[in-house]
Every structure is written in structure tokens, then in C-alpha cells.
Amino acid sequence: MINNKMKTLSDKYPTKMAVTSEIINLKAILNLPKPTEAFMSDLHGEYDAFQHLIRTGAGNLRQKINELFSGEMTPETMQAFAFLVYYPTERLALKHKALSENELNQWYLTTFKRMIDLLKFVSTKYTRSKVRKAMAPDFVYITEELMYGDVANVDKKRYFQEITATIIELGQADALIIATSHTIQRLVVDQWHIIGDIYDRGPHPDLIVDQLTQLPAVDVQWGNHDILWFGAASGSELCLLNLLRICARYNNLAIIEETYGIALTDLVRFAAQHYQANSAFMPVEDPNQGPLTHAEKLKISQVQQALAIMQFKLELTVIKRHPEFNMDHRLLLSQVDFKRRILHLNGQEYPLKNTCFQLVDPENPEALTAEESQIIADLLAAFTRCQKLRKHLTFLIDHGSMYRIYNQNLLFHGCLPVDAQGHFLTLTLANQNYAGKQLLDFFDQQIRSSFNHPLHQANLSTDLLWYLWTGPLSPLFGKNAMTTFERYFCPDPETHVETKNAYYSLRHDADFIQQLLSEFNLSPETGHILNGHTPVKKGHDPIMANRQMIVIDGGFSKAYHHTTGIGGFTLLYNSYGMQLVTHQPFTTKADAIANMKDIISTRRVIDQVSQRQRVSQTNIGAAIKTEIEQLQTLLTIQPDH
């Protein structure tokens, strides 16, 4: 009897010849060089910087141009050509302004040849079929003729000349250059890995997700800020309030109102009625944007206060609902002496400043007012019903996970909670223990469950999304406490301290990293762990533990540039090994195009193989080998005709 898999293959390859042809094709693919992977993290909504790295293949495209044209072009010419491939539409517009018609036509002829040569060069790892799928449908025939034809053949010389001349004559030269540039961009990196935090304070995480949907192969490892958005769309009131408060703090409420069409009118009105100007809640302004007016600052301050107080009230409710979270030390509103304006914390008394507790009942601090309850309910309904947001987050759920194992690399955003000796810490829920890999698997399942049932709002799965944001054993948070309350109200800086999990000090140790690799059934000798989440401070090394631990926070968030001294890191992994790419802060798209200002500054080889890796040694290769085995089985039962 033929099983379902064999039936599907039999329908696809109905004869022995069809099966034989596919086996030959797949065995040949196994011997192609391993395609290039690129890793980036912590995009934080900074779309222009993200898109620049996508267009440049995280620096891989410029490296290909250098390899191909060094000695043929000057460095200045290579830079100009690179930016034409990065930003073809914009750079073509500048060429039209700078050149006469005859000069432009001559430039087209030179550029066609260079474009086709580069396309050939970046296509060498792929089958013709895969390259064809990356091409614009309107130009497949012409591009393949120019790529695979023998241009040196005297008999065909006039044939190729006529193709290029007619392209120019019919006004299709720009369209061909744009289409070829996009094909090159798609081929220069085969697989993109995004290690968390697409969302946060930046203005356009929505555009980042839209761009990700257009990439041929991408996976996402969720970050702590992504979880807030999953939580809000899954019915978590606390995730919603944290998300909105952070948007207000960084003057980014436009993403809520303008991008996702969620009205904040009632919230703004309520905040204006009950809260006054408060210096602790003034928004953080982006120096690249115009200054806010006094009225704008006041409004945002009021909104942020309203959201913070509702958040602190609900924290009491959820922490009491789940004593197994072991978060009683965060029952902060219930530890306030409202008459004396004192916080009782860790056996100490701390004076409070800039308080805004007028809607807090000292006898029942977790109680929401009727108006607060209504505002939260309305906002939560808007978030869970927003189709555009649901579409974006569904893509991240479908293409994402808490961690990914790919080609002997373990990818996750934050940490694995451990004690000072490196032993996994255990989270106990409903008499079940979760630690190490099991902890990540458990959270992965809970996220999907909550997201798929957004109307179930006061259950464990939904509350665990908030725990992932701030809980002491959250692998995405990685600290003992999130001191938001203290930073708003306690002048004493000792209350602001957030102690990192021991993972972050132990990850420098090779034995510890090899222990983690073994936990995930990876080779302790050849595997790597790739993290995001923590910006690499100036003077610190992102490569640790005998080159097996790599931190690649992309540094997209402008707020961290003063800490890191650079823009951040991305990682390239090709058939020759791994390269860590350092990049400088991205200014603006307009500046990059006008001044041909790239952000890639240095490359550092991390791991170089003695023999070039092949597809057969990759995850894709393993899947192909399985398919070959199935096809060989099918070959024994398939008819000749």
C-alpha cells in the first residue's frame, strides 16, 4: 500500500523517467556550495537602516563587487556601481539629470554588461531554476539570453547587440536595471535570520514585516519587545498597557493611530482630565525629528501617566493570580505609604517623587476605576480586532519561534536562565517543571496557544506573555526585576538596579557554551550560539567562548549608539565560514543615496573551514537526502511509462 507521502510523490512524478530526472537533479544540488546566510537582530522598528542592510546583503554585495571587478574598476567606480545596485531607482534618477542622451545610452551599455556579469557571479551557487524564480517575470527571457549566451561567439555578437540596443530604444533600460538589481539583492543572501525585536521604539516595524514577507527565505526568533505586541493582540491587558506606555515614552504613538488605525481619543481625553504635567513622564525626543511643542509634551506626559498607573494596578492583580510566578517582590503599589509618600522595598524605605496616584485607592490599590476599565477593554478590543496588526503578527508567529537550530547554530534572542554555577533554573507551573530547552519549548507552545485564542484573556497562556516580558525566569528578559516603577518615582538610583541573569557572565566560558549546545543536541565542538538583545558596549568583544558564542545586536536603535560607539553587528555565514560585520550608525536613506555612504566598516573572520561546505552538509541538504530516499523507494514501484 502506498502511503500519503508516496501518493503525493507519485502524482508529482508519474513515471520512472520523471523520478529518475528528479533524483539526478537533487543529487546534483547536494554538491553545490552552501548558500549564504545573514543574521541580524534588534531592528527596533528602524526600517530605513534595516532596508539598507537587506539591499546590501549585510555587506555581502559590496564584497562580491570587489571580488569580481577589482582591477577593472577604481574603488570610486565600484562604490557608484554598488549604490546603483542598492538603490537603482534613485541612482538612475540622478544619472538622468547628470548625463546627455548620448552619454546615458553609452552608460546603459556599460552598465548592462556589468549588471549581467554580477548576476552571473552571485548565481553560481544556485540552479538555473532558482535563479529564474528570483527574476522579474517580464525580463526572464532577455536576462537568461544575456546571462547564458556566448557573447564572444562571432555569429551571435550582432544578436546580443540588437537585444541591448532595442531595450534602450524602447525605453526599457531603466526597468531592466531595476529588475536586475532586485534579482541580485535576492540572490546575494539565501537565508535571513532575524534574532528578535522587530518591534520597539522605532517608527516602522510594520514596514519591516512587509519587507520580510517579500524575502525568499526568512525565520524569526522572537524578542522581548515582539512579545508585548503578541500579548496585546492575544488579549493581555498588561502587555497592551506596557506597549502603549513605551510608545508614549518615545513619542511613537503614531504607529498605533496612523499605522494600525487604532483610535486613542478616549485615552487622551481621560488622561487630560486626571493628570497634569509631570517631569518624570516627559517623552524622550528623537534629535532627528523636529522638537515637540509644549502642548504635545503635556499630552504625551498625561497619556504616559495614565497608562503607567493602570499598568501598576494590573500588575498586582496578575501577580496575585499567579503566586507560582514568584513575583511578590513586584507588588509595588501595595508597598506604598501614600500619606508619607514612601516605598517599602527590600526592608528599606525610599521617598517618592513625581507621584501621580490620584486614581489609586490606598485601601485597594489594584482596583481600576470604571473609566479605566472601559478604556482598557476598548483598547484591547481594538488590538485584537485590528486586521493589519493580526496579519503582521501572524507572519511572525508562522515564521518564528523561541529558538531555531539551523546548520549547527543555535539562535535565540535573550538567554537561558541559569544559576551562578551554570545549572538551569526551573520554572514550576501546575506541578510541572520547565528548564533549559524544555523551558523554551514550553513558552513557544504557550505563545501560539494564546495568540490563537485572543478571547481567552485571564488564563495562564495569556498571563505568561506578560511574564515573558518581565518575569525573573523569562529567557527573553533575563533579569531579576524590571524597575519601571522605581525609575519613575524613586530618586535613589540603587532602586533602579536590574540584576542580569548569570547567563550573561557565564557565556564567556567555553565549557558553559558547550553544555548549552549539548542541551540542544548540537556538537559541542563545532556548534555556535547566536544571541541578540544586549548591545555590545564599546571596548567589549561580541565573540566569546572560543568563538562559539556570538552576540549580534544590530545596534539599529539610535538610543544605544552612544553606548556601543558603533551601529552594531551582523553575521554572514557562507560556504567558507563565518564573518562578523561591523557597521556604523545609519543616518538617513537620503544621505546614503546622495553621498553613497555605506555603513559597513570592518569584517572579522570568526570561523574558516578548510574545505568549502556543500549543500549536503546543511539542514536543506538533510531534507533533500530524505526526499532522495523516498524517490528511490518510489522508483521501485513506479511504472515505466
Curated annotation (Swiss-Prot):
Top-level enzyme category: hydrolase
Catalysed conversion reaction: beta-D-fructose 1,6-bisphosphate + H2O = beta-D-fructose 6-phosphate + phosphate
InterPro entries listed in its UniProt record: FBPtase_class3, Metallo-depent_PP-like
Coiled-coil blocks: none
GO biological process: gluconeogenesis
UniProt KW Hydrolase keyword: yes
Pfam families the record matches: FBPase_2
Keyword field: Carbohydrate metabolism, Hydrolase, Manganese
Family, per entry: Belongs to the FBPase class 3 family.
Protein name: Fructose-1,6-bisphosphatase class 3
Organism: Latilactobacillus sakei subsp. sakei (strain 23K)
Gene name of the record: fbp
